[in-house]
Amino acid sequence: DDSLREQAVLIEKELERRGRIDRIDTQGMADPEIRVEFDATRIAALGLSPSDVATTVQTYFQDLAAGELDVAGSNWLVRLKGKSTDAFDLNRFPILGRDGSLRVGDVARVTRTQAERSELVRYEGKPSVLLAVMKAEGANTLELIDEVKDYIETHNELEAVTGTRLVLIDDQTIPTRKALNIMQNNALIGLMLVLVVAWIFLGLKIATLTAIGIPFILAGTFWILQGMDQTLNVTVLLGVVIALGMLVDDAVVVVEAIYYRVERGFSGIDAVLDALKETVAPVTAAVLTTVAAFLPLMLLPGILGKFMMVIPLVVSVALLISLVEAFWMLPGHVLGAGMKLDRDGKTQQFRTRLNRGIRHVYMRLLIRALRRPFTTLAISVCALFGAVGLLASGQIRADFFASDPIRVFYVNIETEPGTRLERTLNLTLEIEKVVRANLGEGEARGVVAYAGQQFTETEPLRGSHRGQVLVGLQPDGREVTDIINEMRESVRAVPGPSRVTFLELAGGPPSSKPISIKVRGSDFSELRAAADEIRNILHNTAGVKDVSDDAQDGRFALQLTLDPDQVARSGLLPADIARNIRILVDGEIVESVQDQGETVDIRVVAADGQFSSPTQLLGAQLPTATGDMISLSELVNADRSPTFGTIRHYNFRRTITVEADIDSEITDTVTSNQSVMEAWGQLQASYPTVNLDFSGELDDIQESLDSIGILFIFGLGVMYLILGTQFKSFGQPLLILVTVPLAFTGVVLGLFVTGNPLSLYTLYGVVALSGIAVNSAIVMISAANDRLIAGMGLKHATLYAARRRVVPIVITVLTTIAGLFSLAAGLGGTSLIWGPVATAIVWGLGFSSVLTLFVVPLLYYLTGRRREIRLNSGT
């Protein structure tokens, strides 16, 4: 153990010298200690008390600065030195109050050893030390773990010399690397799809000119983010993926307008200037409305808000920079390249036929819609109500905190309070054997068993009756949930532990348990009974698993109170009696000394094995003021009784928190909590002083839903103000915002078709989508208004704007969808966190754009007709 500890300390120091590491937390490593262990019976026979031994050591074993001495004009420091790192020096100290013939070594055994352990760790059955490496602020996590791996490899080459081997049990960068790879792959695929769409509709040269601004936009975005102390992480990459398709939207609209004019014989400079005149206002309004939808999401409170705050920042910065690229750099590129149509080959002929075909088919359908306006509107309304019906009927599965699992899980073991640490460790090792038997060959990177501590999702729990098995899995293999379900029954069949639960970690923002119920009351026995009822309810609720609570049964205690009369007659001071009791039971740290950078405590304590029962302790003898001996039982009143364990309070009342996990394939957070509420309603009368507070993930969901709703309304309000300023109208912004419920319809349809759950990330995507979906309507209504100002009739202007804008709308919608399609479909890797955001935008934008092409012109025409009729009747 000493050599293991020395190696662990050496490794800890070597790692901490590296700049990327903030600190290293150790587990299973006891502190060094010098113990002065006396025989209580022997010192009593010599007329000594435990405090005599402790005071002797404390008095001699000290360093004292006595001041300065003036010696021939120089100041000399005067120090009294008594401390030593040699444990045997303590043996020579004479017991105070004696003639010097009796020394510490005559009544006690002095040894250099280790403090009593509060934790025991085993790896493959061998004593081990766990070292948890914490990175310094701003350090690159991936570089740090690579550095640690190199250190492990170098250290293990010297295993024959050091006698120790390092094993990496838990690598938290594995999910990070996986997520980064998913984002990078999907970003690359998305970029390629964007270029393909632009090439199909606009040709290679124009597609290249459109895409050439993307590196500039991303470089500017990353430069600004670096100035704001942001790092490149998964959420930043998600913002890039979301923005990727939209980055070329501005350029597509501008370059399509230029392309349209070149087709009609405009010169290069005239085509650019006329196109900019037409597109600056609507494109700027479209970008600002998108920013208005995204930016308020930075104000989202709670865990979800902190985790995803950077996404709207990335998207907003990138979109604003894209305006600079579209209105300044792109026209320069176009003029420099000499905007000409591609050669009149088969590809260009196909492109021309495609654009004309889209306009022709669209105009035929739009004219039919204008002839049957109420049928078209009825279809849209029915689609909206159908989406609401799918949600209300439960056809869309809800999993508000859907997350990607981490390849690590824990098996938690609890025994009866007061169980010795060694006994708990032995039971934990039995559990470890069963766990290993249920794992495939090479499936685990490492399995560690330890007692005295349990890691949780929030804070570690300590106690000699707690044990835990940590299982680190290989990056690829069976799902963590499947592994746990397969071994659950066999692990729980191991005799001995009073409770066995599993803890499965998940990626994404930290979240509470799906079920977390605070049982509050004043009477502890009634509170305990009510908590047991809640546990029974949860055990009988479908889809609920790993039920636990934080109530701790107390251990038996020997309660001692001083007898004032007896204490007075003995002539002993109460403080001296209390000190002697502490020295007899747990010992007293009388001093400490520094040795090679470590603090070594000096503990005076009765030798082990002297007090195996309360009776033996109470029989300990203490010398009185007259020199007579008196037993401890004569000085104190003793009461043997059970005690309460940890008693927690919430809002000034005693509280037991009952928690459980759920199988999201069977139930969801809201449904399972509702089941408990209904079952408790039938039992509540039996527990009049007890009430329940439902918190945990339910609180997080409610907070996020409330906040997302408020920010959604706020974003719509800002969008309305921007559109009102752009169009100088109160009514036309409302026509544009009609696209938002249409987008919601598409999101619900997408969830239903793909089988994805409704999560808070999906709702996040819906709010973001509200700013994207309006862009098509903006450019269409802007074109119609321009035609009206130019003197066209209402119907002619509506049809002209629709025909003129349908191709750029199709292109921008397809490029946005193309940028996110890979992430939504999982082409470059799947994610339960980011996939729903992309799915919401892809389906919502696709569905709303189709309806927008018909509903917006129709509403524009109908409201315009109504205004004309009102004006004519007024005249």
Where are these regions (language model features)?
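Transmembrane alpha-helices and their membrane-interface boundaries in multi-pass membrane transporters
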Residues: L244-I258, T279-L299, K306-Q348, V469, ...
